[in-house]
Structures are given as C-alpha cells and as structure tokens.
Amino acid sequence: MKKVFVVGPAKSYSKWIKNHELTDKIEEADIVMFTGGEDVDPSLYGAHRHPTTYSNIQRDLEEKAVFEKVKPNQLCVGICRGSQFLCVMNGGKLVQNVSNHAMFGTHEIFGITRGDKWEITSTHHQMQYPFNLNGGDYEVLYASSHRSDFYEGDGIEYLPVEPEIVLYKVSGKPVCLAIQGHPEMMRPEATTLEMLNQLIDKYVTK
C-alpha cells in the first residue's frame, strides 16, 4: 500500500492512484503530491510577470518549504499547477501563456520513446519549460504536438515539443513526476490512468 501525502486541502487529487492510502505525516509518505491552482509566481524562476499570470506567492513559499523537506527516497508527483511548480523547483522555467490548452476537455499526448498515444485532460494556460536544464536532469516522457499558436513568457525560446509528463531527476533533489493533466478528473475506466499508475509504480522507491 502506497502512502500519499497531499500538500494542501485538496485530497481528492490522489483518488486515481491505485492501492494507496492518505497520510497526514509527510515523513511516512511514499508519494508527496502537489496539486492545482494559481500560477507559480515568476519571481521563483527569475522571470518578469506576463499580463495573464495570476499567482499566490504565499502559497508558493509554503509549498517550497514542503518540497525542501521531501527525502530522496520519496517521489514527488505534481498535477497541473503542481507539475509546473515541480519544474520550477528543479530549476526549470514556465511558459506563461499558451493557447488551445485551457479547453476543459481532453487532447492527445504521445510517448517520446514509443510513440504510444493517450488522451489527457487539459485545463491550463501555462506550461513547463525544462529545456534550460541539463539533459540528464529531466526527461520528457509524454508530450503534445504544437497545439498552441504562441508561447509567451520571459526567456522562452522554441519548444521542441509541448511537455505533458516530465520526469525530473536533479542530483540532490527527490525524483519528481510532473503531470500537466488532471487524472482525478478522468473516468475511472480511462486507460490513461493505467499508464499513469504504471509510471507511479516505476518510480516509487520500494
């Protein structure tokens, strides 16, 4: 049974994870989950604020303090805003405005290695930008093709793909699985949930 510590009050974000139970003690957790909400404040990644960015610096700093408590043998999982937060905590930046992703529906993503295709929910207007990191510090596992008509934000260059699920493995920090979509919003029978659970099982320290 995997123990999950959800950062903040939105405990339902973890409901799609198989064979898990919630814990209110972070030190007991196998998985520490960061949830959705406001944009991450650009000051955390050294960027100027885009006109569309709305953030809560108090929340960011509180969650940064939680992230710094996570042990190397615990897996961080980020959902939507949480995925972007984990990108920033690992030294990445954010695209502060994109189009055709805040659709409140699903769109196709594909595996970088095998090209396998899945549907994922999409409710966001910002996006992870890990491409400023060293290649060994991250791996884009799943992506979408260039759905957006633009990629706006301070210091953003061309995106080879649109990152949807990214694994961060920066030395001295916990492994982080950053999922842009909302698995908790998907139908329980959705095959994408099985794929995501396989990723969880792969990276949780036994």
Could you say what each language-model-derived stretch is?
Residues 9, 16-18, 27, 34, ...:
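Amide-donor transfer/coupling interface in amidating biosynthetic enzymes
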Residues 39-41, 83, 128, 185:
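Glycine-rich nucleotide phosphate-binding loop and flanking beta-alpha elements
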